[in-house]
From Swiss-Prot:
This is Uncharacterized protein UL63. It comes from the Viruses. It comes from Human cytomegalovirus (strain AD169) (HHV-5).
Amino acid sequence: ISHQYHERPIALYTNLVILGQPPEKPTRDRAGAARTSRPIPPPVGDLHLFGKKLISLYVTYIYYTLCTPNCRCCIRRKNSPYLYRLNFCLIDTCLELCPPTFSLCITKICVSQKILRCLKTGETCVWVL
């Protein structure tokens, strides 16, 4: 793998900010009672890899609960207060569920067409070039 493929993915993580939306804030009716609105469902986002492959990741709220407090995620180092507040970390999910070789691989944007299954079962992914 060339050096450029090792460096470029860090910038690609900024695209993940479009995958999450904050739930609606609780509103109050005329009587002053709090009424919790139904949360906005997470949208489907596209992440374009190296101009060759296009995959879709459907971000569900389970990703929020899978993160650890000391989440080492590239997303948290970007300018994204919303994702930071929700402790959103896609990489930490991989670190917890996948073998170390895969966690290194996902930080370099190593994905296969079975990435969703890979994140769940810990399969080894292949480089998409």
